[in-house]
Amino acid sequence: MNAQVKRLLQVASLALVSFAAVGPASAGSATGLWIDHTGRGGIEISNCGANLCGRLVWLKDEKNSKACGTQIIGNVKPVAGGKWDGGWIYDPDQGAKYSVEITPMGDKLKVMGYQGSKFLSETMIWRRASGELKRCSA
């Protein structure tokens, strides 16, 4: 193998490693800080072992601060196609838990809550928070 080919392979390997090392809050990731579909809550989604979990960390109406820190997403597992499924989401307005499928779409997050069948589901689009939010205190 000549020196140019070796050098090209080294550069290509370094580029692949660099792309793989992009942090979890990259544009195609479900982790990070998200504004929910109502615009009233900020949820921080993070890795919890091999799964995802999420907590309410910002509230537009600080009078509802008792909900601050509530875990509203849990045990969501990676599945094919970059999606996450098999966990749960808590709806504080309804006081109920549902199954959830999460699909990252750049700076948007498709969050589908369902009970039993995905045929009977509600899909919400969350958007990535553009900056730092003043976190509520739990």
Please give the residue ranges for each predicted region.
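Surface-exposed interaction patches
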Residues: 96-101, 107-115, 121-125
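Bacterial N-terminal signal peptides
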Residues: 11-21
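Sec/Tat signal peptide C-region and signal peptidase I cleavage site
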Residues: 22-27
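Bacterial N-terminal signal peptides that target proteins for export
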Residues: 2-12
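Edge beta-strand at a domain terminus
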Residues: 117-138
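Central antiparallel beta-sheet cores of small beta-barrel/beta-sandwich binding domains
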Residues: 30-99, 131
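Mature extracellular/passenger domains of Gram-negative fimbrial/pilin and adhesin proteins
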Residues: 76, 106, 134-136
